[in-house]
Amino acid sequence: MPEPYGAPIGANEAKKAAAAAIAEARVNGWAMAVAVVDTGGFLVYFEKMDDTQTGSVAVAIGKARCAALFKRPTKAFQDVLAGGGDGLRVLGLEGAVPVEGGVPLVRDGKIVGAIGLSGGASSQDGQCARAGADSIVA
């Protein structure tokens, strides 16, 4: 069962998570857009690295919102969809983004927001999102 919601993430902590995600992207030579949202899915912080495709802006925000609103990584939706059959129902969920790269941000066992990245392959987006999430784990 997913963690409960806690007090929403603030700007300073959101910037810290984004900075860790961007550092991971830079080390690997990837250009990314990163979005951090609060528990309601509202944007708290956003940054687009130089040379990031503009389409990644909306995708990063969507991944972050999905992870916050559904309390799970977007990869969970990707995996369900890949299974086909009843998993295709995920396409009918408003706000679901079935592509890896969105991860809930958890502090003290409670979801405080989520981070979403876009710009690379979905596995690269996920790797950077997890780096951002790992930066705030208490």
Can you name each region flagged by the protein language model?
Residues 1-138:
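Flexible, solvent-exposed loop/hinge segments and secondary-structure transition points
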